[in-house]
Structures are given as C-alpha cells and as structure tokens.
C-alpha cells in the first residue's frame, strides 16, 4: 500500500482563466488546488467546505494553529503547512487518510499527535526545522524514517492492547427470516463461515492502517476464537487456517467445546519441508459431535483436477493448474437426538440422515475471474460425485421424497454477487462464453464438470444440477470483506433446496459505528480479521417415515 501510483501536484501550479465565451457556453470551472499566501494569521471557516480539494498550499504564512475542521477536506492528497508558526497539530489530522504528502517544515512543533500514524498512505513527511524531541528526530532520520516514524506513532496510538479492549463494537443483530416447519420431522442446526486471515498475510504492507501489535497472531487469535465460541455454531467452516495453528490452537480449543474437525492445507504443502509446511494455510470444517458423526472426509485439489481435465486447454494448464487452492468436504450423519418431530407425534425413530458440508477458498486475484469460475465448477462437480456415490449406498427410504443428500456449501469465493461464480451457483449454470472466462479456450475441458457429463449436451451452458440458495439474500449484508481499498461481499453460505431453509442470520456490524470510529479498514484492534463472519441457522426437512395403514413406522435397515 498504496497501490495506485501517486502523481504530486505540478509545482508551477499553472492555471487557465475561462473566457467569457466559454462561460456563456456553459463550461464548468474545475479547480482541485488552492494556494493561500500573504502572512495569513487565521483561516476562514468556509475553507473547510471545499471538500473537492486535492491539494492545499498554506506555506509561508503566520498560522499558529490548524483547526480540527481541516479533516473535512477528506480528498486532500497534498497539504503544505511549511514555514508557519504552528505549535501543535489537531489529532483529527490523522483521519485524512488520503494524504500522500504532508509538509510541516520550519514550524514550532515539539511533539506530534500519535494519530498521525494513521496516515498509512503518506509517502512524504516534512519535519525539518522543528524543535522536535530527540526520540522523534532519531526515528525520522533513520533510513525509511517516514515509515518508521508513522509505524511508531500508530503502534503507540492506543497505548497498550489492554486499553483498547474496553471499547468493543456493538453486537451484531440477529435477523429472523422464518419460523421452523412444525408439520413434519426436522432438524435445526447452525453454520458459521469465517476467513480468519492467516498470520503470514497479515502484514503492514497490506494493512498499513492497523497497528503492528493488532496484526500479531497472538493478539488476533483470542478475538477470533472468542467470536467462534460466542456464535456456538454446530458447524464451523474456516478459511486461511495455518496448518500449525489448526493442530495447536483451533483443534485444541474447539475439541474442549465438543467439536471434531477436518483440515487440509493448500496443495503447495506437499512439496515443502516439514518446517515450511507448518505455515501453509488451508480450509477447516468443525462440527459438534453431540449433533453429528463423521462418515467421510474429502480433499479437493484444484490443480490436480485441472491437470487431469485440461483436454489440451492452455488456459487450464497455465492459469488454473498453477493455483494451489483447495476445498474440503465432510459427510456427516445427523444424530437421532437432534431430530424434532411434529407436535403430538411420537418419536418412532428413523433411518440415518446424512448431510454433506463443503468448504473452499478460491483464488484471490481480480484479474483471474476465469480461474475462480473454473475452480468453483471443479469443486461442485467433485461435491456432486461425493453425494452421488454416497446416495447410491443408501436406501430410497433414507433419501425420501428429495432423492438426494442435502448440501451446505461455505466459501470465500473472492467473487462479488454479480460475478460468473455466483451466477453459476445460484442459477444452476453459466454460459460457456460468459465474460468471466475472458474469451479463453476452456470449452472442451469444462464439459467434464457439467452435470450432463462429458458426453452430454451442454447447449452452450455448464450446469451443476443442484438447487442452491444463499443464506444471505441480497441486501442483508453490505460487505463481508472490509479493507481500506476494497469493501464487498465475497464470502457465502449456500444450501440445497428444498431440503434446507434459512431460519435466521447474523446481521452486519453497525456501519455507523465503523464511520463514527473512523475505521477505514480491517483488521483493527477491535476486529481481528479483514473478513466478517457469516452465521446462519438452517432447518433440515427430513423425509416422512414409511406408513403402514396410516401409521408411521421406522424404516427397516
């Protein structure tokens, strides 16, 4: 960070005076810079209404103070306050996070507000000619002194981690969507989906707005496990779980609370030494053993599938096969104690009920929309194979009127709701010429992943055969990923209809709280990941028991 190239203002500050003819023709004036000079002692309050300004030149005046209202100029990237008589700076200056240059040379500054450390995009900080304390000067004069000084200020902004824990964000509200069906056998269970931000990705280069102590895994993991445990979900799907942390932290903590789990690291782990392998991240699924028993577990390696199904496609080999993302799936059996019978009906027992829970983390790069879409197709194809194979081993009485095993799919898809990935999942398929394929030649290999099979008729469309619905319908969650330069929905919980329904979901974090606290991105000392967790309560509709003379009887095994 910053990712965009910064172009400083032209020092000549050339201007053009609009002619009367241009004005008569309705030409609009545009000026993004303002210079005020002439030994000015105070500034008009109307200056702070010019929020369109990107550069403000106030050097060589007689200003002794800068009002806090300067923070209203939120588009400023350049601010020159050099050669004035400024003795102190307002803390609100730290909220001007768009600043790339801040010139404070030749003033009377003895100290700097710690809030200045929030200016993580600042590239130039001029402090020469100020009677600053020696510790600040020492940092500033080191190589890469501006960055070191800003990091020091940010890390000390809140004093210690202890002090910040008293200002917790407001609880996220629970949104009820519908009541459970009391007319038939059902089972209620809850699902959490959460990208916990792996330690090796939590760097100051990516998250310069977050203090280094709040990026530290030992600090973040406490809040992460607290969030997981407070939701008390029956099924927990996590992405970006470091291998070592799965075994030494997550599995240990969650087993104590009655969970069992399954984890697989990304494919690169297989080529690494044991020491390196510890730091590879992957996907994990945890489930409460009082509610489910494990029947099968599966790992889906997308690069292996790409290689096996390339069909001569260079794009499949050069773009998909080179990415080491994975997915995992567990086939669970619902314990009979979790089944709720209609009121007044005796609990006569039932055949075993299976459910497949899948979890995946797709490639991150926005330039690789084709890869995300192909990875999603491969994953759903493998999930369908797992379900079909497991269904063949079950009696029809177990599957009931639905004829298949229900699916819960959790994922960080790294794809927005208007993407080909989400269109594919939610509508049942996608056109082979969809724009997200970037006109690359995938057609022959994609037919392998269509529900019609390699020899089936695609009619120009790749389908998956499930009827999937998102637990979080449009508008319920404005974003699941919240960083300074990206805020959007990329995490999802899908489930198969008609066996499953959503009864309720955990709503978003209060946006007003984020704004009022000037939280421009996460992680943050109070928010441990750059993702917000998803949490939904689902209802599983179970098959009716076989009837003899109108009486329900348990199915025979």
From Swiss-Prot:
This is CCR4-NOT transcription complex subunit 6. One of its GO terms (biological process) is positive regulation of cytoplasmic mRNA processing body assembly. Poly(A) nuclease with 3'-5' RNase activity. Catalytic component of the CCR4-NOT complex which is one of the major cellular mRNA deadenylases and is linked to various cellular processes including bulk mRNA degradation, miRNA-mediated repression, translational repression during translational initiation and general transcription regulation. Additional complex functions may be a consequence of its influence on mRNA expression. Involved in mRNA decay mediated by the major-protein-coding determinant of instability (mCRD) of the FOS gene in the cytoplasm. The keyword Membrane does not apply. Component of the CCR4-NOT complex; distinct complexes seem to exist that differ in the participation of probably mutually exclusive catalytic subunits; the complex contains two deadenylase subunits, CNOT6 or CNOT6L, and CNOT7 or CNOT8. Interacts with CNOT7 and CNOT8. Interacts with UNR. Interacts with ZFP36L1 (via N-terminus). Interacts with ZNF335. Its cofactor is Mg(2+). It is found in: Cytoplasm; Nucleus. One of its GO terms (cellular component) is CCR4-NOT complex. Substrate binds at residues 240, 276, 361, 366, 414, 481, 486. InterPro entries: CCR4/nocturin_mRNA_transcr (IPR050410), Cnot6 (IPR034966), Endo/exonu/phosph_ase_sf (IPR036691), Endo/exonuclease/phosphatase (IPR005135), Leu-rich_rpt (IPR001611), Leu-rich_rpt_typical-subtyp (IPR003591), LRR_dom_sf (IPR032675). PANTHER family: CARBON CATABOLITE REPRESSOR PROTEIN 4 (PTHR12121), CCR4-NOT TRANSCRIPTION COMPLEX SUBUNIT 6 (PTHR12121:SF33). The gene is CNOT6. Residues 153-557 are annotated as: Nuclease domain. Belongs to the CCR4/nocturin family. Its EC number is 3.1.13.4. It catalyses: Exonucleolytic cleavage of poly(A) to 5'-AMP. Mg(2+) 1 binds at residue 240. Mg(2+) 2 binds at residue 412. Keywords: Activator, Cytoplasm, Exonuclease, Hydrolase, Leucine-rich repeat, Magnesium, Metal-binding, Nuclease, Nucleus, Repeat, RNA-binding, RNA-mediated gene silencing, Transcription, Transcription regulation, Translation regulation. The active site is at 412 (proton donor/acceptor). One of its GO terms (molecular function) is metal ion binding. It holds the Pfam family Exo_endo_phos. Binds 2 magnesium ions, but the ions interact each with only 1 or 2 residues. LRR repeats lie at residues 52-73, 75-96, 98-120, 121-143.
């Amino acid at each position: 960070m910053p990712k965009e190239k910064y172009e400083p203002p032209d020092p000549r500050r050339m201007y053009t005076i609009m002619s009367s003819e241009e004005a008569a023709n309705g030409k609009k004036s545009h000026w993004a810079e303002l210079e005020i000079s002439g030994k000015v002692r105070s500034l008009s309050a109307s200056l702070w209404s010019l929020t369109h300004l990107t550069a403000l030149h106030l050097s060589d005046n007689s200003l002794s103070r800068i009002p806090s209202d300067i923070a209203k100029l939120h588009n400023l990237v350049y601010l020159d306050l050099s050669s004035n008589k400024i003795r102190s700076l307002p803390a609100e200056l730290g909220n001007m996070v768009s600043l790339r240059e801040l010139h404070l040379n030749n003033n009377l500054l003895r100290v700097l507000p710690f809030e200045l450390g929030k200016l993580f995009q600042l590239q130039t900080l001029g402090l020469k000619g100020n009677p600053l304390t020696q510790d600040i000067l020492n940092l500033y004069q080191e190589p890469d002194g501006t960055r070191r000084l800003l990091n020091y200020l940010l890390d000390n902004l809140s004093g210690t981690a202890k002090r910040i824990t008293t200002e917790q964000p407001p609880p996220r509200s629970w949104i009820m969507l519908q009541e459970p069906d009391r007319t038939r056998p059902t089972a209620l269970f809850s699902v959490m989906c959460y990208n916990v931000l792996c330690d090796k990705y939590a760097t100051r280069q990516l998250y310069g707005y977050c203090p280094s102590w709040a990026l530290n895994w030992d600090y973040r993991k406490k809040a992460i496990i607290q969030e997981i445990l407070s939701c008390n979900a029956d099924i927990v799907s996590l992405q970006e779980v470091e291998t070592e942390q799965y075994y030494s932290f997550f599995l240990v903590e969650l087993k104590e609370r009655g969970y069992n789990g399954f984890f697989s690291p990304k494919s690169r782990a297989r080529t690494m030494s044991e020491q390196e392998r510890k730091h590879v991240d992957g996907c994990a699924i945890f489930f409460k053993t009082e509610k489910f028993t494990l029947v099968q577990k599966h790992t889906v390696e997308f690069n292996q599938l790409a290689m096996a199904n390339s069909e001569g496609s260079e794009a499949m080999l050069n773009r998909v096969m080179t990415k080491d993302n994975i997915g995992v799936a567990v086939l669970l059996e619902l314990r009979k104690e979790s089944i709720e019978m209609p009121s007044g009906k005796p609990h006569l027992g039932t055949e075993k009920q299976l459910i497949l829970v899948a979890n995946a983390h797709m490639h991150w790069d926005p330039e690789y929309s084709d890869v995300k879409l192909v990875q999603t197709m491969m994953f759903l194809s493998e999930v369908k194979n797992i379900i079909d194979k497991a269904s063949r081993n079950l009696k029809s009485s177990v599957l009931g009127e639905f004829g298949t095993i229900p699916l819960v799919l959790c994922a960080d898809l790294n794809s927005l709701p208007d993407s080909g990935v989400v269109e594919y999942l939610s509508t049942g398929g996608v056109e082979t010429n969809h724009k997200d394929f970037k006109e690359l030649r995938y057609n022959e290999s994609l037919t392998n992943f269509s529900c019609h099979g390699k020899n089936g008729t695609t009619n120009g469309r790749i389908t998956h055969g499930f009827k999937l619905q998102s637990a979080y319908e449009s508008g319920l969650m404005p974003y699941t990923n919240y960083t300074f330069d990206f805020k959007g929905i990329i995490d999802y919980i899908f489930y198969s209809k008609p066996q499953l329904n959503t009864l309720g979901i955990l709503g978003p974090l209060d946006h007003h709280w984020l704004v009022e606290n000037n939280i421009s991105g996460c992680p943050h000392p109070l928010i441990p990941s750059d993702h917000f967790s998803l949490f939904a309560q689902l209802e599983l509709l179970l098959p009716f028991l076989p009837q003899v003379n109108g009486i329900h009887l348990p199915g025979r095994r």
